[in-house]
Design a protein with these regions (language model features):
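Sec-dependent signal peptide recognition
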Residues: 1-9
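Bacterial extracytoplasmic/cell-wall-associated proteins, especially those involved in peptidoglycan
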Residues: 8, 14-177
Length: 177
């Protein structure tokens, strides 16, 4: 199924992503994910990347908040706090383990502060519109929970069902065969 057919189907039968109460950081987490995963893409690419996050929030196999989905991955304690045995748990610092997160930008060791403030603000406004149901959000991925760039072939891809290709990403869901 091509993108035009999916968008048309979505307009006819809009898939509503349930976002009853929006936690404070949810729009920021979604905007950061759009920024680092699809900022140079058009609306379809931004919606597709966002749909994967929101589909995961609504799937019991993943964390149930936007930020927990975006930040999902193993963590380790900082060497600075690990050396102090009597330090309270609230004062300990934890960081994601490099290159082991669900979304690579979150644990690539680089700053997560967007350089292009104007673009980030546009994406933050879009994510707020999505989260607060101010715009009609169509899941153009047909329920995808996974994606990767089209220039890589991860081992997990052959165990999933491909749903669509949008710009430079390929989207998948659990294999239902």
């Amino acid at each position: 199924m091509n993108l035009a057919a999916i968008v048309l189907a979505g307009v006819v039968s809009t898939v509503a992503i349930q976002t009853q109460q929006v936690p404070d950081r949810a729009p920021e987490c979604l905007a950061l994910n759009m920024y680092y995963e699809a900022r140079s893409q058009g609306t379809a690419g931004l919606f597709a990347v966002s749909a994967v996050v929101l589909n995961r929030v609504n799937d019991s196999r993943f964390p149930n908040s936007v930020c927990e989905v975006v930040e999902q991955g193993p963590i380790r304690e900082s060497w600075k706090t690990r050396q102090h045995k009597n330090l309270s748990s609230s004062k300990r610092k934890y960081y994601p383990i490099k290159n082991r997160c669900q979304f690579s930008w979150y644990c690539d060791g680089k700053s997560d502060v967007p350089r292009n403030k104007k673009k980030y603000q546009e994406l933050l406004d879009l994510s707020k519109s999505i989260m607060y149901n101010e715009i009609s959000f169509v899941d153009v991925t047909d329920g995808a929970l996974f994606y990767h760039a089209d220039y890589v072939t991860p081992g997990w891809a052959k165990t999933k069902q491909k749903t669509i290709e949008i710009q430079d990403h390929i989207f998948y869901r659990w294999n239902t065969k």
